[in-house]
């Protein structure tokens, strides 16, 4: 399974600002179809934000944008809100299995 390396935590963001989180894989993600982004808050299950690298999951606002291919992927949060404070994970698959990045905590400052 590939190793996924994310932007180190914490990342500070201002309300109304923009945050970019990177995810780098040691192997090419299989056809880019198996790269996803998740949001996790304390005491809550992870919430899927992005699938197939750039597709928004149902109910996720368009402020969240996924991009990238191969071994380099990015999650961008625009017009940051206080509710966006969370830990964000990328997850990806190659032919041997699925793995997750270490997570990037986003701290929102008003």
Swiss-Prot record:
Positions of the UniProt region annotated as Complementarity-determining-1: 24-36
Keywords from the UniProt entry: Adaptive immunity, Immunity, Immunoglobulin
Region (Framework-1): 1-23
Region feature (Framework-4): 100-109
Residues under site feature: At the hapten combining site: 98
Span list, region Framework-2: 37-51
Span list, region Framework-3: 59-90
Further facts: This chain was obtained from antibody to p-azobenzoate and was isolated from the serum of a single rabbit.
Protein name: Ig kappa chain V region 2717
Source species of the chain: Oryctolagus cuniculus (Rabbit)
């Amino acid at each position: 399974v590939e190793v996924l390396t994310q932007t180190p935590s914490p990342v500070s963001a201002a309300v109304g600002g923009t945050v970019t989180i990177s995810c780098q894989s040691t192997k090419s993600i299989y056809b880019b179809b198996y790269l996803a982004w998740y949001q996790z808050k304390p005491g809550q299950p992870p919430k899927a934000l992005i699938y197939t690298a750039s597709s928004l999951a149902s109910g996720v606002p368009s402020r969240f944008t996924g991009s990238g291919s191969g071994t380099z992927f990015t999650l961008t949060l625009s017009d940051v809100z206080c509710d966006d404070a969370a830990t964000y994970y990328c997850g990806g698959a190659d032919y041997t299995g699925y793995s997750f990045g270490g997570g990037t905590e986003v701290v929102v400052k008003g």
